[in-house]
């Protein structure tokens, strides 16, 4: 029986996938401590979008969060963060001195391992950052970024087992120092067959004892199958998550994968009862956070227009903020062409952001009318060399609109010449704002820009979306506005016309103005469908199956004939119930004396 290790990605990737990375530190530390007690030894705790989100939305410092996590787990647990090569944890690529500062600061604040990837798989972008991670005394996990391609696109030779193994050979030839190798599929679109063949080939290429880790999401519904294929191919460790931030756009749940491995030659070797308890605690802690419905859904369209789980929910949160969520189906549809014409870079941050920004522009302004800044610079080569040559017409449009010539120069050299990047430039910004010029503050300014400076000045806002906030937003509107908003948000859904009609019927029914004379009449109304109801301000999804509901009409009460010498009711003594419940029968009439035993 082979034991398969796992890394719990709940506290970074799970938060990013399900809550748009907007979670307070104090709300997850108890679950982190409980997971350690249950036996988890590896955690992804920060980096990626969770670095900026703490400053942008949570009114917190990412370095303080790392310190708190290390204090909770103790000295021996592996705490891992995610880095984007030359971008480190910023959305723009950085100069060499900031890349080096990133590694030294994360070591200082309790991190054990940095997973280091480049979405374009330009090995030059992994070389310098990997060396800095190694020099800082951290473990360097070098990454092969994976992605599934839409049908009929495999002839490009990108994102095939041979392509990935060639990239691995480039890493080995470049002599980049590494402690382990990860295969990361942020969109969850790589097929199980490609996963198996790739990891099987990598196992043959790598020195004996090299740890291979596999990362995927369940966005397209293939997470369990791909994890098992990775294990069969020779992976030593897989990335898993815990409810409520598991499944759908997030990673496969620990308990789900434990169940899949039962009866095979593999095991996670966990006490499942302990993890049931930890997940129950975690669910309770996360209850107040609003989780958008798309976060937990399997979306088959993602296989054709790859969007990472972490980016999908982060972008839908922002689209909600800007009242553009109704455009999402068309944006996702337009992503297919954007990926193909952009050169097939893996759909993972920051490239996934470039894809969705360009797809959004194509949706809003017309196809290829406007080339967005990030996408344009990418196809022109300013972030590295894409896996395939971008579309010539798109490159021409980018050149004309951005006024920048195509380049094959090393990104680090370009950035080192940029006067608005680097330690000196950001020190000057801090000095101008009267902010202490510490290494941490320099890095925050470099990676978070104006919002980072604002945070350091105490000017930050809470951008977390709680269930109570959503409930208030809905309650503040009239029923007609709620129905109209629901129609607009779901106008592209299959069968939605029928559901909308039912909703409108239910919302528009008002009690009659006056009693209706005549016998009681029962009317059968159809209520099948999915609805959201609110109990104490918390939304709950409710499904009504086909059946009938009784809708009694009001019946006029016949006049009461005045009785002669009607007896006065007994004053009585209140009898409080021992506990809350339902009244199922009444043994006596009003005014009668209650006897013992009744």
Question: Where do the protein language model's features map onto the residues?
Answer:
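Catalytic cores of alpha/beta
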Residues: 98, 159, 163-166, 220-235
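Short histidine-centered loop motifs in beta-beta connectors
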Residues: 578, 584-593
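Terminal or standalone catalytic/regulatory effector modules within metabolic enzymes
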Residues: 36-54, 296-301, 310-556
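Conserved, mostly hydrophobic/aromatic
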Residues: 6, 14, 35, 116, ...
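Hydrophobic faces of well-ordered beta-strands that scaffold small-molecule active sites
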Residues: 5-13, 41-45, 77-84, 112-115, ...
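Glycine-rich phosphate-binding active-site loops on the catalytic face of alpha/beta enzymes
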Residues: 116-119, 185, 233-252
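Active-site beta->alpha loop and helix N-cap motifs at the rims of alpha/beta catalytic domains
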Residues: 42, 47-166, 187-190
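N-terminal amphipathic alpha-helix/helix-capping segment at the start of soluble metabolic enzymes
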Residues: 1-18, 66
């Amino acid at each position: 029986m082979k034991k398969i290790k796992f890394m719990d990605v709940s506290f970074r990737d799970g938060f990013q996938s399900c809550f748009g990375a907007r979670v307070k530190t104090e709300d997850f530390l108890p679950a982190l401590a409980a997971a350690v007690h249950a036996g988890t030894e590896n955690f992804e705790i920060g980096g990626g979008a969770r670095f900026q989100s703490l400053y942008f939305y949570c009114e917190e410092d990412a370095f303080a969060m790392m310190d708190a996590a290390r204090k909770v787990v103790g000295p021996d647990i592996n705490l891992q963060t995610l880095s984007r090569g030359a971008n480190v944890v910023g959305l723009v690529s950085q100069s060499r001195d900031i890349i080096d500062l990133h590694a030294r600061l994360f070591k200082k604040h309790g991190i054990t391992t940095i997973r280091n990837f480049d979405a374009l798989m330009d090995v030059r972008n992994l070389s310098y950052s990997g060396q800095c991670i190694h020099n800082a005394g951290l473990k360097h996990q070098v990454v092969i970024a994976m992605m599934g391609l839409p049908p009929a696109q495999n002839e490009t030779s990108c994102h095939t087992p041979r392509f990935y193994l060639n990239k691995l050979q480039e890493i080995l030839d470049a002599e980049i120092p590494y402690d382990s190798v990860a295969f990361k599929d942020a969109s969850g679109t790589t097929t199980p067959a490609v996963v198996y063949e790739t990891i099987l080939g990598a196992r043959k290429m790598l020195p004996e004892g090299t740890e291979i880790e596999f990362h995927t999401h369940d966005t397209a519904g293939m997470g369990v199958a791909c994890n098992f294929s990775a294990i069969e191919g020779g992976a030593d460790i897989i990335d898993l998550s815990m409810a409520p931030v598991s499944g759908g756009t997030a990673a496969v749940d620990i308990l789900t994968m434990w169940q899949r491995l039962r009866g095979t030659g593999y095991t996670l070797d966990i006490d499942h009862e302990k993890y049931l308890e930890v997940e129950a605690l975690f669910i309770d802690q996360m209850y107040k956070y609003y989780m958008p419905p798309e976060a937990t859904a399997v979306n088959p369209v993602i296989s054709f227009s790859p969007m990472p789980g972490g980016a999908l929910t982060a972008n839908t949160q922002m689209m909600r903020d800007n009242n553009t969520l109704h455009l999402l189906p068309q944006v996702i549809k337009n992503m297919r062409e954007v990926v193909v014409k952009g050169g097939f870079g893996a759909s993972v941050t920051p490239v996934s952001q470039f894809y969705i920004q360009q797809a959004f522009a194509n949706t809003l302004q017309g196809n290829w009318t406007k080339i967005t800044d990030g996408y344009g610079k990418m196809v022109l080569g300013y972030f590295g060399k894409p896996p395939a040559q971008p579309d010539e017409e798109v490159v021409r449009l980018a050149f004309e609109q951005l006024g920048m010539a195509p380049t094959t120069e090393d990104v680090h050299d370009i950035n080192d010449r940029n006067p608005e990047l680097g330690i000196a430039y950001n020190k000057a910004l801090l000095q101008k704002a009267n902010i202490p010029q510490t290494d941490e503050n320099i890095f925050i300014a470099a990676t978070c820009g104006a919002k980072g400076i604002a945070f350091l000045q105490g000017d930050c806002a809470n951008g977390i979306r709680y269930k109570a906030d959503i409930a208030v937003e809905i309650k503040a509107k009239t029923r007609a506005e709620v129905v109209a908003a629901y129609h607009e948000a779901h106008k592209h859904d299959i069968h939605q016309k029928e559901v909308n009609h039912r909703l409108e019927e239910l919302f528009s029914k008002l009690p009659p103005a006056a009693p209706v004379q005549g016998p009681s009449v029962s009317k059968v109304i159809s209520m099948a469908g999915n609805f959201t109801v609110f109990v104490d301000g918390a939304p709950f999804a409710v499904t009504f199956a086909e059946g009938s509901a009784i809708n009694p009409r009001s019946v006029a009460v016949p006049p009461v004939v005045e009785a002669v010498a009607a007896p006065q009711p007994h004053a009585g003594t209140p009898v409080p119930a021992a506990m809350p419940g339902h009244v199922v029968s009444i043994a006596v009439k009003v005014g009668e004396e209650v006897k013992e035993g009744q």
